[in-house]
């Protein structure tokens, strides 16, 4: 029987797929003809595990990564964005690492399940260089910009800073 997935690319038509085998993150390759079309397959995106932590507010996300064009993933992951530029994907990665975004995620994420509906309270952003947020800054500096943008009180900021673990 012919193998569908391979440990290394064997053709220019191959797509890299991020998945899990025995709870370990793996990369395999598959011919593009076996992959259903998706809006972000040929775009930059951020890939995050669909299952993460226990649901406690403030948890760090388990190793989010930038997905380059021609990288897909199994249903063990979710992806955010479909960008033409790596800059936008990097800005998105910084955003999901902010305390602000993860606090908003924590308002709906009460289990380890990190499915798309749990992100509903995380405000969408402009991740281009024209954004009102300077994405070239550090994550903590981006948090400060987000606190100001959304008019958070000193009490709200103190709560986030105390309860949400930092990510770099």
Predicted regions and their residues:
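Polybasic, glycine- and aromatic-enriched phosphate-binding surface used to engage nucleic acids
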Residues: 1-135, 139-141, 148, 162-168
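Short acidic, low-complexity intrinsically disordered linear motifs used
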Residues: 145-157
